[in-house]
Design a protein with these regions (language model features):
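Interdomain motor-coupling "hinge/lid" segment immediately C-terminal to the ATP-binding subdomain
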Residues: 1-72
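Residue-level marker of alpha-helix boundaries and capping positions
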Residues: 4-5, 89-90, 168
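Short acidic, hydrophobic short linear motifs in intrinsically disordered regions
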Residues: 74-87
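Generic structural signal for secondary-structure transition and capping sites
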Residues: 22-23, 75, 108, 186
Length: 239
């Protein structure tokens, strides 16, 4: 065991990384100034460059609209990315797939696809119409979440840098876990399935394939120790 003091220090450093991110310009700015306001300004500049490139790919602005809604979509706890929420109802599915393909190829996002039947292997059972999007850099994700507000209104910075783990930051941690899993060479999958009453769904945040085994991952942002989805998944696929 590392001990509580070491664990607290490591988690504090990790949350600082979540706030700054890994973009070289943002890291350099933090090392030079130790000022998150300056870091946030740098990250806003990077996002502007991204959106300029998105506009060159699609002058209707729809790729930017997809990208901009990622934090709101993750924070809503929806079981999939809602294209209509980002673009409205008038975009046909073929055009949507093209826009998403261009966004994915830009390497600015990570995508997790729903595995309809993890028992037969995730790549064999993915649902290409059911997916989630994550921003590829945790620091850009946090800036993007408050892109239209002033730095001082971005409460995520305050929550991350306090020693109190906040249960409402689950989606922020989910995004950084997606980044870490992708950086380690994993393809991202997730899984939802109905509860025994059928009124709600369990959701396993990520699934990894290891040989003939499926490894479920549930992301928690606070000291909350219950993990009903993980327990139900293990029971469902224990045989």
């Amino acid at each position: 065991s590392m001990g509580d003091a070491v664990t607290r220090k490591l988690m504090r450093d990790f949350r600082l990384y979540m706030a700054v991110g890994g973009m070289p310009q943002a890291v350099c700015e933090y090392l030079e100034t130790n000022n998150l306001l300056d870091v946030d300004r740098v990250k806003r500049g990077i996002i502007q460059l991204y959106e300029y490139d998105f506009y060159r790919l699609d002058q209707s602005g729809r790729i930017s609209m997809l990208f901009d809604t990622i934090p709101a979509q993750l924070s809503s706890n929806a079981s999939r990315f809602q294209v209509a929420s980002a673009l409205g109802d008038n975009v046909d599915s073929e055009k949507t797939l093209q826009l998403i393909s261009e966004l994915r190829e830009s390497k600015t996002i990570n995508m997790a696809y729903h595995a309809n039947d993890p028992a037969v292997g995730m790549p064999l059972s993915i649902d290409l119409k059911k997916y989630k999007m994550f921003v590829a850099d945790t620091g850009l994700f946090i800036t993007l979440a408050f892109k239209d507000k002033d730095f001082t209104e971005n409460v995520i910075y305050q929550k991350l840098l306090s020693d109190k783990l906040d249960a409402n930051l689950g989606y922020v941690y989910e995004n950084v876990v997606a980044q870490m899993l992708t950086a380690a060479g994993n393809k991202l999958f997730y899984y939802t399935f109905p509860t025994s009453t059928g009124k709600h769904n369990y959701e396993v945040d990520f699934l990894l394939s290891r040989g003939n085994k499926v490894c479920p991952i549930e992301v928690k942002s606070s000291g909350y120790k219950r993990h009903a989805s993980l327990d139900a998944f293990c029971e469902k696929f224990s045989s």
